[in-house]
Amino acid sequence: AAKDIKFGVEARGLMLQGVEQLADAVKVTMGPKGRNVVIE
């Protein structure tokens, strides 16, 4: 939910999951055969 506030190790783990998801979505746009990605 948008209003959940997390602290400490739990917050770090959840943030890492989000960053990894974003990186997976964006990495296909890199390189000579880069494709378009829509992030909702």
Swiss-Prot record:
Induction: By heat shock. Keywords: ATP-binding, Chaperone, Mitochondrion, Nucleotide-binding, Stress response. It is found in: Mitochondrion. The keyword ATP-binding applies. Its main location: mitochondrion. Implicated in mitochondrial protein import and macromolecular assembly. May facilitate the correct folding of imported proteins. May also prevent misfolding and promote the refolding and proper assembly of unfolded polypeptides generated under stress conditions in the mitochondrial matrix. This is Chaperonin HSP60, mitochondrial. It comes from Solanum tuberosum.
